[in-house]
């Protein structure tokens, strides 16, 4: 099986192109040579056969072959908005959420967030997490890379959400341990096939009561994953699996 690489450039059968710097570095690290076959995808759908034609000191040229309209994506659009877990656990969550099939991720600051980011540091983290998502797609066979959005405060992000409509139905689920909360599996039973899902998950310790109330006022409904208290990243990934495999 040929090694897979993401390249954010236009592609056409028979074209010769120079790989973007980040992709070229990846090819060079693997010590690949001219004549070797690789697979390229650009996030626009499907993937391309390609052959390395030249290896420079810092650049790599390839010739594109056939396009394969293969898609390994799930049919439903699912967004995950979450209070960021600490340190490397966010990297792991982005990687696994991408492998499962999330469409977009929204990192959030909440009242109980341990990880706090702003300015240049926030931008660097966003770019890093986007790179983690790219690498996960290269590994798992996905041809559409999920978007990792800039870090936002929860309240500010909630204000940006568009209203759901009959043409674009959205189920907005707040992961909660509050008494009387309906199981997520029940909320998904009658979900139309064309409906998107947006999950809001808190950091360690969950969202505060005030934050949950703010989310509910913005159209979210509380759902539970069961009686056990799951780690922040475990809860988020469990919800994704249930929504994408109902």
Regions flagged by a language model, labelled:
Residues 1-69, 120:
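N-terminal positively charged helical leader segments and presequences
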Residues 28, 98-101, 216:
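Non-catalytic positions within long, well-ordered alpha-helices that form the structural scaffold/packing
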Residues 209-246:
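Structured adenosyl-cofactor binding patch, chiefly the S-adenosyl-L-methionine
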Residues 164, 169-211, 220-224:
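Active-site/ligand-binding-proximal alpha/beta "capping" segment
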Residues 33, 103, 221:
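Short acidic/polar active-site loop segments enriched in Thr and Asp
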Residues 68, 204-205, 227-230:
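Short, acidic/turn-prone active-site loops that include or flank metal/cofactor-
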Residues 71-173:
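RNA substrate-binding interface of SAM-dependent RNA methyltransferases
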């Amino acid at each position: 099986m040929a090694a897979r690489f993401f390249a954010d450039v236009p592609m056409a059968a028979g074209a010769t192109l120079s790989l973007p710097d980040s992709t070229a570095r990846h090819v060079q690290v693997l010590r690949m040579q001219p004549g070797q076959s690789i697979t390229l995808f650009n996030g626009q759908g499907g993937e391309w056969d390609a052959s390395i034609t030249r290896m420079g000191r810092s650049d790599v040229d390839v010739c594109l072959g056939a396009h394969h309209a293969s898609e390994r994506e799930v049919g439903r659009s699912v967004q995950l908005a979450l209070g960021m877990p600490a340190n490397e656990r966010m990297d792991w969550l982005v990687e696994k959420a991408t492998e499962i099939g999330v469409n977009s991720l929204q990192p959030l600051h909440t009242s109980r967030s341990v990880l706090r980011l702003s300015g240049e540091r926030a931008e660097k983290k966003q770019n890093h997490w986007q790179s983690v998502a790219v690498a996960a797609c290269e590994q798992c066979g996905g041809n559409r890379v999920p978007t990792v959005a800039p870090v936002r405060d929860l309240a500010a992000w909630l204000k940006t959400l568009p209203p759901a409509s009959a043409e674009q139905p959205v189920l907005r689920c707040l992961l909660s341990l509050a008494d009387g909360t309906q199981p997520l599996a029940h909320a998904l039973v009658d979900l139309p096939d064309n409906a998107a899902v947006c999950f809001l998950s808190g950091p360690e310790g969950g969202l505060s009561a005030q934050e949950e109330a703010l989310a509910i006022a913005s159209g979210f409904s509380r759902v539970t994953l069961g009686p056990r208290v799951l780690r922040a990243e475990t809860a988020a990934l469990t919800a994704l699996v249930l929504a994408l495999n109902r």
